[in-house]
Structures are given as structure tokens and as C-alpha cells.
Amino acid sequence: LRHLCNLRSSFFFFFFSVPPVFDDSYYGFVIHEIREMTVMNMGNYAHGNQPIQHMIYLYNYAKQPWKAQYWLRQVMNKMYTPTPDGYCGDEDNGQTSAWYVFTALGFYPVCPGSNEYVVGAPLFKKATIHLENGKDVTIEAPLNSEENLYIKEMKLNGKSYTHNYFSHEDLMNGAKIQIEMSNLPNENRGIAAEDAPYSFSVDEK
């Protein structure tokens, strides 16, 4: 991802090209995956086609994690509803529902071959994961609401935490994740180079 951003000259220009995913301008004609997404005002983001389900999390790689937080909530609210048309696309061996479970908790394994889970934003005010080793992962976001969908501040085990990822070890050792949610994006959090999740490529000199 880092090299892809570099090929686009800068992080800004890389993500200047990404927002059109959320409109219907790309193809110029109707295809079935896009028809249902357009109806939901999601444009070309075909969530029912599993290979795209990591895409929103990529904002975390380019210093704009608040955009991931916004769009992830939009997908959960619009595409997972208890109505006849409330579940987009197909399941593909549990991937679409697994995406929701991870995303509702506030993180997702974008690159399963790494040891990292990329941060989104939780859907609940509190959730607890009881691990097989007897330890717990607790995610607390008491101000969470339909309006308060952005991460203002986050702590991991009592310490301020700005990274846009958790390591597998962080979670498996038991973790307490405390998140202060806000109705405004914090554009100063998670923007340092060391806050970006794993990338196979690194900056080239």
C-alpha cells in the first residue's frame, strides 16, 4: 500500500482517486452488482462482492482514518438491516457476516498474513471477547451513538494509542480498549507514519 501511495505521487492524490468509488460514474453503464449499491447511495462500492470488503479500511494506510470510520458505519447501517432487502450480495462461506462481526467490534484483518487488525470504529458501547486462553478483550465506547461515529481518542490498556492497528499479540494477551467517540472527525489522530498498518512495501529513497 505504501508503494501504491507513492506511485500516486502523494497520499492526497492517492485518495483523491478513491472517493469516486462511492458514486456511480466509473462504469458508465449499469451492471448488476452496482445497481443495488447505487440504490443504497454507495455507488461503485459493491459490498456484496467480497474482494472489495477490505477497501474502506485502506484510508488507515494513507493518513485519513476518519474516512474509514464514516464509511464503515454507513455500510453497517445500510447493508445489514432486518428487512427482506437488508442483506446485500451473498455470503461466500461466511465472509460477509464475518466482516460485520469484526467491523462492529472495531477492527478487521485486512492482511491476514500479517499479525495486524486494522482499526475501524466500534458499533457498540461495550463488547467483550472471551478468548480461548481465558483472557478477555474488552472494547468500551460509552459515548457511541448514531451521531458519534468518529474516534476522538483511544487508549490500549490505559495508555494513549494512536496506531491504526492492533497486533494479534495485543489482543491475545488480553486487552482493554477504551475509545472516546465524537460526532466530529479527529483529523490529527492516526496520521503519523508509524500509525499506518503493515505494508509489504516501504518508502523508497
Regions found by a protein language model. Give the residues of each.
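Active-site core of glycosidic bond-cleaving carbohydrate-active enzymes
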Residues: 1, 8-138, 143, 169
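Beta-rich accessory regions
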Residues: 66, 81, 111-114, 118-205
